């Protein structure tokens, strides 16, 4: 394994700065930008370029064949929920190395699915999990350990052990939210087997802090950087990223849905999978897959019960 000190232009002091800034992993270093590395590690941009170039050579980052991509995708894992219909809709569960977005009005089940995934990621692979831990970035004060207990009971898991493997960060503004996402690298490098990152909800702070058309460009730029950091974590560490999103009304809509997901094209392009949640009759929920690189559009019906998500 190549160590930081083995790279050209990296002495003990530079290596220490890189580790302190969360760049101890060679792939994390290879996928950074010179500006990002320069700012976070407090090194010159010229040095940053040389370090990144050396890291890319050590990781052999170059063109690869479609066959190589297929082989790499064999490492992709899936995190299931208690509804077989929902799992089938998204190809077996929430996918690692990807960002999955669910959006819908309040009470449509976004946070409920988030809580369930925080538990099921801890299941062994043969039961639909990844034997992993979860990071839960809570922006709206919706995380409830009591709900985790109910779902863990439904899966007959040890409640204390389940709670210990969920790392919760209460984000109070968009800058804090971005910082907590960046600190996930440190958690992983400390030996925590993080396999799922949940952001519930992604846009709440951005929506509240950047008001008016004149601030839209700044908001979208900041959001894009945040999503890029989340995707980098997903790719580097084979992690699933699950984000919930709000909707807004379309008053000029006479046909189709009267609501749409917020976040604009930046979020639309960043999300690998997009799932629209709707309320149905008799307490049912409807999940519709509206965007995927390889799965067809479709929908399923599920219910939310004390023990979690069920068909």
From Swiss-Prot:
It comes from the Archaea. ATP binds at residues 104-111. CDD domains: archRadA (cd19515). GO terms for molecular function: ATP binding; ATP hydrolysis activity; ATP-dependent DNA damage sensor activity; damaged DNA binding. One of its GO terms (biological process) is DNA repair. Keywords: ATP-binding, DNA damage, DNA recombination, DNA-binding, Nucleotide-binding. InterPro entries: AAA+_ATPase, DNA_recomb/repair_Rad51_C, DNA_recomb/repair_RadA, DNA_recomb/repair_RecA-like, DNA_repair_Rad51/TF_NusA_a-hlx, Hlx-hairpin-Hlx_DNA-bd_motif, P-loop_NTPase, RecA_ATP-bd. Gene3D superfamilies: 5' to 3' exonuclease, C-terminal subdomain, P-loop containing nucleotide triphosphate hydrolases. Involved in DNA repair and in homologous recombination. Binds and assemble on single-stranded DNA to form a nucleoprotein filament. Hydrolyzes ATP in a ssDNA-dependent manner and promotes DNA strand exchange between homologous DNA molecules. PANTHER family: MEIOTIC RECOMBINATION PROTEIN DMC1_LIM15 HOMOLOG, RECA/RAD51/RADA DNA STRAND-PAIRING FAMILY MEMBER. Belongs to the eukaryotic RecA-like protein family. This is DNA repair and recombination protein RadA. It comes from Methanobrevibacter smithii (strain ATCC 35061 / DSM 861 / OCM 144 / PS).
